[in-house]
Each structure stands twice: as C-alpha cells, then as structure tokens.
C-alpha cells in the first residue's frame, strides 16, 4: 500500500491540522483478535513446558545423559544440558512459531518472506541462543554453589552487565546476520534526518535503514544498541510508504528514546525484575524440591536439572509483573512522542504517521483493558493520534518539557 493511496481525514491544512482517528478494518479486528489467542497460547506453553519437564522427570534424565557424555565434568554437563534445553524448547515451540510468524502473516497479506528464508532465520536464532546459553548458564549454577544464600542477588545484579553486553553485540554482530543494514537510500531525506539528529546531539552515523521489504509489508522503526553501538533503525518499508515529514516525526520519536535514556531505565527495570524473580525462586524452591524432588529427578537447586523450575517460577513472576512493566513502557512511548512533537513541531505529520502505522500494520486504534494490561507496550493509536492533535505548547507560549534536550 503506497503512502499516497491512503485517505487521511484532516480538519484543516498545515502543521497543526487535526487528523481524525480512523475506524479499524474488519481484517485488522480479526488480526488483533487472533493475535490475542496466539499470545495466550504462547504464554500457556511458556509455563506448561517447564512444568512438563519437571513433573515427568525428563529434566533429570536429560541432565543424567549430559553428565554421562561430559564424564561428570560440571561445566561441560551444564553446557550440554543448556544445548538440550534450548533445542527442546525450540522444537516444542516450532509449530506455534511457524504459524504465528509465517502462515498467519501470509494469510493477512503482511509477509513477503519465503518459507526457506523464515526457516533459515529460525535456525540462526536457535543456534545463537544455543551458543549464548551454553556459554553463560554455568554462572548462576556456580553462584548457587559458592553462595547458596545470596546467589539470587548476585545473579540478579549480573543481569545489568550481561544485558549491556548483549545490547553492544546485538546491532554490530547479530542483527546483520538476519538483515541488511546501510545508510539511507534517499539523500535528501537522509540530510533532513541528519539535521534533526544533529539538533539532539546524535551523530549522523547512528541513523540506519534496514532492508525489510523482502520479508514484510509492515512498517517499523526502533532504537537499538548501547553506548558506541547505539543507533536508530528505520525499516525501508517505512521510508517508502511514509511522507518525508512523517518519517521525520518517527525519527523524532526515536530520538526521544535516545536522548531520554530509556535504554538505561529498561536495564534497571529488568535487573530489578530478574532479581525479584530469583528471590522468589530461592524462597519456594526448597519446599518444591522437598515435596516433588523424587518426581523432578533432583534434590538440590544447584543441580542444572532445576533449570525448568527457575523458568517456571520466574515466568510466573514475569507474567504477574507484566502490567507494571508495560505501564512503564507506555509512559516511555508517550514521552518519546512528546519529544518528537517538540523537536519537529509538526502535529499533523505525527498524527498522519500514526494513521499509516495503523493501516499498514493492521492495528486497531482502541484495544481494551486486558490488552493494555498484558500486551500493550505502546499507548493505543487512538490516544497517540489525539495527543498528536492537541499537544502544542509552543503555540500557547508555554515551555517545552524537553526543550533543553535539543537545539532550536
């Protein structure tokens, strides 16, 4: 769908013209509802799989096999168990992942990816997960052995540096394995975006365009990386379908995440949440092992066969904490919208960009309470369009909330 084929209702012309919230198409409503069903299925499977590995004793048998192959060497046993666990998880989830990521996307006209390409990306993702798990899983089990009373605290605190490491490595070494990144193809638009980024103190080398049109018809943009690897990435589908002023607002929004240091907030929040989850595991593990240890096939938490127990309890805690984590995410997105509006001062372009996101991504403008509690990482598009229509303090002579974060 080309940008000029969309009909966007406005009440006036110019940068302050208001844009009406469009009604969702029947296809978008169907896509939204089917997404809710898939989310519920994936969430249930996330909890059922580790429970099954525990209560069938399969986890203990896998550890026994790994231990035999590793000749009872602890680190090698943990690495082999990690490989087996990731492969079991990947294969169990494969039918659901295939349907959600390939079949469903093609059924709704959102994907252009071939089956071979999808399976190739899936295999690469599994291989990378296997590698990281085999290299890192020994850390919590080593801490469990040397500090059985405080292992949960040390492991939780290690979440921060490990997350930073992944964020540094991801855009430079991992993401290019899946997609082609480069400078923007439109020199005029690139210069326009570079000027905007320069006002916020972001070097022009941090703006990338990624070739996604071979995989999808959806549009997106995001901030990735940490420190020297931090960058703003625009999908080529977004650049092709949005007007230049709409792209400029989208970049302004991503600049908001960049200069407001939302990545640091995410790292701190993730560290606290992981630490809380591990503390709860620490508190309940003794009782669970005492009651079900014979069925589980292990009698100590520092046995790597306990990994499904950590995954089960940790997953339940993460699910319970989702409403709070998603509320924080929605606040960050709103503030990024605010900074994007302040730095571009083009309300109309912002509202039009949200309309195009709604139509190209088969989104619904208003979701509902349950969605917002358990899935809503962004404000409803209707709220974002209405906010874009009305937020213009510069016209009323009021100070900008983030006026000190960028040059005029």
What does each model-identified segment do?
Residues 4-301, 311, 315-408:
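Polar-ligand-bearing catalytic/cofactor-coordination segments
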């Amino acid at each position: 769908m080309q940008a000029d084929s969309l009909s966007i209702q406005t009440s006036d012309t110019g940068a302050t013209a208001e844009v009406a919230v469009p009604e969702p198409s029947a296809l978008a409503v169907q896509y939204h509802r089917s997404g809710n069903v898939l989310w519920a299925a994936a969430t249930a499977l996330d909890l059922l799989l580790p429970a099954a590995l525990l209560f069938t004793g399969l986890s203990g048998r896998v550890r026994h096999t790994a231990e035999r192959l590793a000749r009872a060497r602890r680190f090698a046993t943990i690495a082999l168990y990690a490989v087996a666990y990731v492969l079991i998880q990947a294969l169990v989830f494969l039918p659901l992942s295939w349907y959600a990521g390939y079949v469903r996307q093609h059924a709704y006209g959102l994907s252009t990816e071939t089956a071979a390409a999808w399976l190739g990306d899936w295999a690469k993702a599994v291989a990378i997960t296997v590698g990281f798990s085999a290299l890192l899983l020994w850390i919590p089990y080593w801490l469990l052995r040397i500090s059985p009373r405080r292992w949960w605290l040390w492991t939780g605190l290690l979440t921060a540096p490990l997350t930073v490491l992944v964020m540094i490595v991801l855009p430079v070494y991992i993401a290019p394995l899946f997609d082609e990144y480069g400078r923007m193809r439109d020199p005029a638009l690139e210069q326009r975006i570079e000027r905007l980024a320069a006002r916020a103190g972001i070097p022009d080398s941090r703006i990338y365009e990624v070739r996604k049109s071979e995989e999808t018809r959806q549009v997106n943009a995001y901030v990735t990386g940490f420190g020297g690897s931090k960058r703003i990435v625009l999908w080529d589908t977004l650049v092709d379908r949005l007007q230049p002023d709409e792209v400029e607002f989208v970049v302004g929004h991503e600049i908001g995440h960049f200069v407001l240091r939302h990545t640091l907030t995410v790292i701190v929040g993730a560290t606290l949440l992981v630490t809380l989850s591990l503390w709860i595991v620490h508190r309940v593990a003794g009782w669970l092992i005492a009651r079900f240890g014979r069925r589980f096939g292990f009698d100590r938490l520092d046995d790597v066969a306990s990994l499904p127990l950590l995954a089960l309890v940790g997953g339940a805690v993460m699910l319970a904490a989702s409403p709070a984590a998603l509320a924080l995410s929605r606040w960050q997105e709103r503030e990024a919208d605010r900074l994007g509006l302040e730095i571009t001062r083009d309300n109309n372009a912002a509202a039009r960009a949200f309309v195009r996101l709604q139509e190209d991504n088969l989104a619904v403008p208003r979701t509902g309470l349950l969605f917002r509690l358990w899935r809503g990482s962004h404000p409803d598009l209707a709220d974002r369009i209405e906010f874009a229509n009305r937020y213009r303090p510069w016209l009323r002579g009021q100070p900008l909330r983030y006026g000190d974060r960028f040059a005029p």
